[in-house]
């Protein structure tokens, strides 16, 4: 199935516009909505993919994001706060990181699957967060970790088409030393949007 429509859920963060631009650059229709969108409204839009954006608050303060993750049958990518929402939606724990990471790049090691398919390993991921996944539920697999502080940087549901990344693919700090990947963040988003689920 060719993906035509991507719904981006805005958790009131300026990075959301970079995500919207990435999806548009890939040639897909993108619709940006507030995090208070209802399940009925999502059904009317009928998207092929959902991206849950970063944001400044906690997962419990991210509008309807946790409920959406638990109830829709559409592939979902969570970025930063969106990733944390995925962890909490399935019973995991999100808490304060030992140090705040706002505008820092870390080397990230990953499993080479899902959104990480054909991505150099490791790569630099841009980090902007003070919260982190502390405990991942059994439904989720850890897919990526930061090499400098060993924090969880990626999760994937074991059965459902749901992935999350703590780092920001859409940040200028997300890059690779490999010249074959001049825009690594765009490739990560493309992998999600074009994955066969």
Swiss-Prot record:
L-glutamine binds at residues 55-57, 84, 130-131. Keywords: Amino-acid biosynthesis, Aromatic amino acid biosynthesis, Glutamine amidotransferase, Lyase, Tryptophan biosynthesis. InterPro entries: Anth_synth/Amidotransfase, Class_I_gatase-like, GATASE, TrpG/PapA_dom. It is an enzyme of class 4 (lyase). It catalyses: chorismate + L-glutamine = anthranilate + pyruvate + L-glutamate + H(+). It holds the Pfam family GATase. Its EC number is 4.1.3.27. The keyword Cell membrane does not apply. One of its GO terms (molecular function) is anthranilate synthase activity. GO terms for biological process: L-tryptophan biosynthetic process. The keyword Ribosomal protein does not apply. Residues 5-197 form the Glutamine amidotransferase type-1 domain. The active site is at 80 (nucleophile), 168 (for gatase activity), 170 (for gatase activity). Heterotetramer consisting of two non-identical subunits: a beta subunit (TrpG) and a large alpha subunit (TrpE). Part of a heterotetrameric complex that catalyzes the two-step biosynthesis of anthranilate, an intermediate in the biosynthesis of L-tryptophan. In the first step, the glutamine-binding beta subunit (TrpG) of anthranilate synthase (AS) provides the glutamine amidotransferase activity which generates ammonia as a substrate that, along with chorismate, is used in the second step, catalyzed by the large alpha subunit of AS (TrpE) to produce anthranilate. In the absence of TrpG, TrpE can synthesize anthranilate directly from chorismate and high concentrations of ammonia. This is Anthranilate synthase component 2. It comes from Methanocaldococcus jannaschii (strain ATCC 43067 / DSM 2661 / JAL-1 / JCM 10045 / NBRC 100440). The gene is trpG.
């Amino acid at each position: 199935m060719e993906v035509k429509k991507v719904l981006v859920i805005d958790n009131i963060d300026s990075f959301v516009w970079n995500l919207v631009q990435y999806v548009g650059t890939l040639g897909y229709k993108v619709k940006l909505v507030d995090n208070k969108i209802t399940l009925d409204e999502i059904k009317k839009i009928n998207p092929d993919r959902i991206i849950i954006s970063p944001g400044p608050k906690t997962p419990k303060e991210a509008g309807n994001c946790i409920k959406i993750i638990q109830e829709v049958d559409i592939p979902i990518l969570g970025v930063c706060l969106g990733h944390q929402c995925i962890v909490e939606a399935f019973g995991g724990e999100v808490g304060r990181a030992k140090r705040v990471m706002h505008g820092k790049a870390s080397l990230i090691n990953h499993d080479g699957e899902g959104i990480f398919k054909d991505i150099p390993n490791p790569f630099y991921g841009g980090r902007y967060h003070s919260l982190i996944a502390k405990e991942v539920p059994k439904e989720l697999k850890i897919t990526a970790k930061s090499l400098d502080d060993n924090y969880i940087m990626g999760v994937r549901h074991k059965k459902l088409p749901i992935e999350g990344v703590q780092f920001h693919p859409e940040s200028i700090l997300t890059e690779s030393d490999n010249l074959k990947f001049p825009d690594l963040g765009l490739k990560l988003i493309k992998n999600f949007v074009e994955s066969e689920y």
